[in-house]
């Protein structure tokens, strides 16, 4: 994808380089388009450099090689203080409260498109760019819209729903128009060291480590009982924080423990008794709900979509979008009704709304219900 150089030489773009193929190709494309490109490597986590697990040093090594190859200057900045205060402490507090947070969404909101953006502006940047699979469109009035990436399998708009107009107006997502195999092809053609580098998986600061081992360093585990809906003890857990709703693996309960022989799923948590409630079968009512409540709303346009408008939403990243409507919005809390019941709606996770290709924004789930009357009873 060799692009003819436009007269972009007076426009400085600082690219957040992670050491992966996506951000590498982001820098490559902008360089080909004639922008004044600089790279910035963010260190968001302290404590790994002396451990056996040390991805940051390897990533920085790859970033240095990319910058040398593309002949662009590199800034290395430590945002670990901001990350700890704005992302990680919230992550721990949510787990202590029995919820399941999504720190990658908060990292985008508080670090990549806040701390990094602000710092880039002090370095004279006109824009920042990242290797996200999403797109930004602008209308004649300067209003920005967040669109899904063209690669449906890689679309990351779900993780970017918190971005506001100012952040979008200063951001670029050059690979949002491309599909992942082509991104790798471009990297290989340009002889970039990252062309065959494995995609990172899992929560950014945990990486390939075992989640349980990592969390134990910060939160004391409180073992307890796993009970069925009758309150009968059917197993034991090592800590509620290790279980997310709808989880099947790791319960240690044989499928034949109950009468049905169906597999067991974690369905609810009782923080007062430190009990995990498990049910049999993925179609159990405790696992499936048509209503949810959510707060901490972020709308790309700056305001909530029209109530009872036909929308689509998803309650987890890999879920296909589901038809729904927002029934009410009051004091920063919304009530959402789906056309069909959704499995394992999880407090702490985000519900993100779409209208066609456009991501409208989202909110953090606070509860899941079978009816409006059930919501009113809970108030």
UniProtKB/Swiss-Prot annotation:
It holds the Pfam family tRNA_Me_trans. The record marks 132, 349 as: Interaction with tRNA. It catalyses: S-sulfanyl-L-cysteinyl-[protein] + uridine(34) in tRNA + AH2 + ATP = 2-thiouridine(34) in tRNA + L-cysteinyl-[protein] + A + AMP + diphosphate + H(+). Its EC number is 2.8.1.13. The keyword tRNA processing applies. Keywords: ATP-binding, Cytoplasm, Disulfide bond, Nucleotide-binding, RNA-binding, Transferase, tRNA processing, tRNA-binding. ATP binds at residues 16-23, 42, 131. GO terms for biological process: tRNA wobble position uridine thiolation. Belongs to the MnmA/TRMU family. NCBIfam families: PRK00143.1, trmU. Catalyzes the 2-thiolation of uridine at the wobble position (U34) of tRNA, leading to the formation of s(2)U34. This is tRNA-specific 2-thiouridylase MnmA. The lineage of its organism: Bacteria, Pseudomonadati, Pseudomonadota, Gammaproteobacteria, Thiotrichales.
């Amino acid at each position: 994808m060799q692009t003819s150089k436009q007269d972009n030489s007076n426009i400085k773009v600082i690219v957040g380089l992670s050491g992966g193929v996506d951000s590498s190709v982001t820098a490559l494309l902008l360089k080909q388009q004639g922008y004044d490109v600089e790279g910035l490597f963010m260190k968001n986590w302290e404590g790994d450099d002396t451990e056996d697990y040390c991805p940051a040093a390897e990533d920085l090594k790859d970033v240095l090689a990319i910058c040398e190859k593309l002949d662009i200057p590199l800034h290395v900045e430590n945002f670990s203080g901001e990350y700890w205060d704005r992302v990680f402490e919230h992550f721990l507090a949510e787990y202590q409260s029995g919820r399941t947070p999504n720190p990658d969404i908060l990292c985008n909101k508080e670090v990549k498109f806040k701390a990094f953006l602000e710092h880039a502006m002090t370095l004279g940047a006109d824009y920042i760019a990242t290797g996200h699979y999403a797109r930004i469109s602008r209308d004649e009035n300067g209003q920005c819209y967040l669109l899904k990436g063209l690669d449906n399998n890689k679309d990351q708009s779900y993780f970017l729903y918190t971005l506001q107009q100012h952040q979008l107006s200063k951001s670029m997502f050059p690979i949002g128009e491309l599909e992942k195999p082509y991104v790798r092809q471009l990297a290989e053609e340009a002889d970039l060291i990252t062309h065959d580098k494995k995609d990172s998986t899992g929560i950014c600061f945990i990486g390939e480590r075992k989640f349980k081992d990592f969390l134990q360093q910060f939160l004391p585990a409180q073992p307890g009982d796993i009970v069925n809906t009758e309150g009968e003890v059917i197993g034991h857990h090592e800590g509620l924080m290790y279980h997310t709703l709808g989880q099947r693996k790791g319960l240690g309960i044989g499928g034949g423990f109950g009468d049905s022989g169906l597999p067991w799923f974690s369905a609810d948590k009782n923080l007062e008794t430190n009990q995990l409630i498990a049910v049999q079968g993925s179609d159990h009512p405790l696992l499936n709900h048509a209503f949810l409540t959510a707060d901490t709303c972020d709308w790309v346009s700056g305001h909530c979509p029209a109530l009872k408008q036909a929308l689509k939403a998803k309650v987890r990243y890999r879920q296909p979008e589901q038809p729904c409507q927002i029934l009410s919005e009051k004091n920063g809390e919304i009530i959402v009704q789906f056309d069909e019941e959704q499995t394992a709606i999880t407090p702490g996770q985000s519900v993100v709304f779409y209208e066609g290709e456009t991501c409208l924004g989202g909110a953090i789930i606070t509860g899941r219900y079978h009816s409006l009357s059930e919501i009113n009873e809970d108030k």
